[in-house]
Amino acid sequence: MAGHSQFKNIMHRKGRQDAQKSKLFSKLAREITVAAKLGAPDPAMNARLRSAIIAARQENMPKDNIERAIKKAIGSDGDNYDEMRYEGYGPGGVAVIVEALTDNRNRAASDIRSYFTKSGGNLGETGSVAFMFDHTGLIEYDAGVASADDVLDAAIEAGADDVLSSDTGHEVYASHDTFREVAKALEAKFGEARKAALIWKPQNTVPVDDETGEKLLKLIDLLNEHDDVQNVYANFEISDALMAKMGG
């Protein structure tokens, strides 16, 4: 399961990389605003907004900030953001998916393309690497919420596809189509999840050496530092020693 553990760590590098909470809060607020604008401003009626609020709470984002982001969606003077997905290959031919919310498509595309190029990779067309990933729902709970067997039983009953339990928590995977229903059923049984979101999960991971791995982690960090970038996914596997060295 080393590859899976690293995939989780790579996904979570964003929180550690955003040294300034203000940058992280800005990204979280942007997702809340977009989610509220695309659906109802009530999280009880808007699953994406609820997921965004859960993510904000996990990062201790103040309640006032969350409410302000929702109100921004209701007002007519708020910024308009486009949801963009960029796909390409990083060092070593590793597949990378970048999700962004931007108010300037040309700027975002130019910046992200330059990051790929400088790292020795290249930005491709939409769909060029997505087939190597599953767009799936991930629902996470702390380990103490219930036993592995209880979570598994509840997940199966709710219609989940897979469950992985460890001493760090429970991860429930559900298809794109059933994710919201599964999350709702689990919340009714175990309470609010610590994470509930649609992700790009690599179908397989590609082992790379430390030199390539270091370049890839630097690319991911560079992408995450961009104001428009919300999430970065990649399908590589590196040594635990390098992950620890690079702060994973």
UniProtKB/Swiss-Prot annotation:
GO terms for cellular component: cytosol. GO terms for biological process: regulation of DNA-templated transcription. GO terms for molecular function: DNA binding. It is found in: Cytoplasm. Keywords: Cytoplasm, DNA-binding, Transcription, Transcription regulation. Residues 1-21 are annotated as: Disordered. Its main location: cytoplasm. Gene3D superfamilies: 1.10.10.200, 3.30.70.980. Pfam families: TACO1_YebC_N, Transcrip_reg. Signal peptide: none annotated. HAMAP family: Transcrip_reg_TACO1. Belongs to the TACO1 family. This is Probable transcriptional regulatory protein RPE_4771. It comes from Rhodopseudomonas palustris (strain BisA53).
